[in-house]
Amino acid sequence: MEDDREEGSCEVIRARLRENFDGKIVRKDLTKKIKEGANVPVYVLEFLLGQYCSSDDDEVIHAGVEKVKRILADNFVRPDEAQKILSVLRQHGSHTVIDMITVRLNIHNDSYEADFSNLGLKAVPVSEEYPTKYDRLLCGGIWCIVQLDYEYVEEDKKGTPIRIRKLTPIQMPHVDLDELKRGRKVFTTKEWLDVLLRSIGMEPDVLTNREKWLLLARMLPLVENNFNFCELGPRSTGKSHLYKEISPNSILVSGGQTTVANLFYNMGRKTIGLVGLWDCVAFDEVAGITFKDKDGIQIMKDYMASGSFARGKEEKAASASMVFVGNINQSVDVLLKTSSLFDPFPPEMGTDTAFLDRIHCYLPGWEIPKFRPEHFTNDYGFITDYLAEFMRELRKEQYGDAIEKYFRLGKNLN
């Protein structure tokens, strides 16, 4: 596992990143500056910064930041301004918007149609070239810059007057894993670890080696299918940040209350729940986890054990990882004397050995320092959407037997 190559300085790492991942990296302090005033997902913001600010020249960076601000101000669609933008589109005949676009095939008339999330438009005709070229449009949708035309035709009252002239994704439309692996080879293991940590906004130079690996372990549910992960620790250590802000493929269930229909399967609508729609379902504040259904926790245990669950007459399978994060308000020593390390869980989960057996990894959150300004990086890292997409691609590769090369597990482990 060790890499004997000589470690490079920050400048060397930056040069290697620019050479091998140009357009896919961004200076993280720029994200912080613009994010404060822009109500737009981090991964969209960083994609734009990666396009216009991937340089060491301060003038180029300044011009790029101004361009990104202008693009967001002029084109980003806020849901409460949807009608105003449609009116501008009608008056001028054309307008460019930034919105989340989902495309589906209408099999009745053999054509593709696009839905706009914030703009509220449904079934807008879209050329076949876009879903063919950008398959993520068909798999849950991606954020795009879209040039729209408005042309009302008296004879075609049933159709929509809105047409898509051009569509450009502002998320990674596709990630080439082979290209990533080729680029990875020019970095040592330590350098690559630092790059990954900077990509999620952390500064590795102020962390110990163990703290680095603990932070990296938070990414496990995003790269492994059906991985059950638990982290309990003090406040202000960023336990839920990764699942809420960094990856567009994970969802954070705040407050803890949920239903079997919402999480697993809705019998009335015949639709799959969160575990079928997301790569990772994270529960914030485990102390508040409650199911309105009596059989909720039992169904969750079945899913955590096998990756499937029974609803009605059929069994459904899904690949989402389950993450449980929560706060420990006492010291660990006191907790171990008075109860257990699973004390923050509701009793029906924290004292159920069948549930605890299904947890693959318990991350000791008390070993991660409380975050201060110096813990956040101003250096280069991958744009979050690129990081999230290559983590999603890694879910397709199996590493379940990798541990056998280094360890032999006893028979008493299940």
Where are these regions (language model features)?
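Intrinsically disordered, low-complexity boundary segments flanking structured domains
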Residues: 129-134, 239, 345-352
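Phosphate-sensing "switch" segment of ASCE/P-loop ATPases
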Residues: 315-322, 327-414
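Conserved phosphate/pyrophosphate-binding and hydrolysis machinery centered on Walker-type P-loop NTPases
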Residues: 182, 186, 208-212, 377-380, ...
